């Protein structure tokens, strides 16, 4: 009840704007004139703009004063077609457009990472992330871009799981297991086994049978190492 309507926001009172995602952003953000004005003014004033998952929908229809699309020749990330269509095969008929397609159509250099894992792009004062598992890196990069050092914090169990899954996809099961052991040797660290297990389901949905069993093996290995610890 205390949310300020965008039309009433005095953008000059803030140093940064951060757009989070959710499917509703696909309908609410692209045509919102208040959002377009804030983003255009922030970008041209070199203020910091962060957006993650479907949050970059806020950027797709912004035109700068020079007549060029904001996204033209910008390195960006956002929820990918592959991620969208795996979860919602009929997404193209439900949503006005797919975010990846729209960003590319606006001239963006779209950077995609592994499905449902951390991927961030940083282009001057524009910081974007692919999905909800990019939120930590995007948020901390926004803080650094503002000229501050993020406060020390404990790395979450979810982040540790993301690191392990990235290691698996990029370097294989053995490297992922080595990383599991390394993380669990630090008694303060925990690993979100459920998140890793969910990626076995993603592998199955993609028809990747070996990936399914490999990731299930990682879940079992985490449990085994936790019991040893």
Which residues does each PLM region occupy?
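Active-site-adjacent pocket-lining segments in enzyme domains
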Residues: 1-50, 54-229
């Amino acid at each position: 009840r205390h949310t300020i309507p965008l039309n009433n926001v005095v953008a000059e009172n803030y140093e940064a704007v951060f757009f989070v995602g959710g499917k509703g952003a696909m309908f609410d953000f692209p045509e919102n004139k208040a959002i377009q004005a804030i983003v255009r003014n922030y970008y041209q004033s070199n203020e910091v703009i962060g957006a993650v998952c479907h949050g970059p929908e806020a950027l797709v229809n912004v035109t700068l004063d020079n007549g060029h699309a904001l996204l033209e020749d910008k390195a960006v990330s956002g929820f990918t077609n592959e991620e969208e269509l795996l979860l919602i095969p009929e997404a193209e008929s439900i949503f006005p457009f797919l975010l990846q397609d729209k960003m590319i159509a606006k001239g963006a250099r779209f950077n995609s990472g592994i499905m449902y894992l951390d991927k961030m792009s940083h282009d001057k004062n524009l910081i974007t992330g692919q999905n909800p598992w990019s939120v930590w890196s995007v948020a901390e990069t926004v803080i650094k871009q503002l000229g501050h050092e993020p406060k020390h914090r404990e790395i979450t169990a979810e982040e540790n799981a993301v690191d392990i899954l990235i290691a698996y996809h990029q370097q294989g099961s053995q490297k992922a297991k080595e990383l599991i052991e390394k993380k669990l040797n630090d008694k303060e660290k925990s690993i979100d086994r459920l998140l890793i297990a969910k990626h076995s389901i993603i592998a199955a949905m993609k028809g990747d049978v070996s990936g399914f069993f490999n990731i299930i093996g990682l879940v079992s290995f985490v449990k085994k190492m936790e019991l040893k610890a």
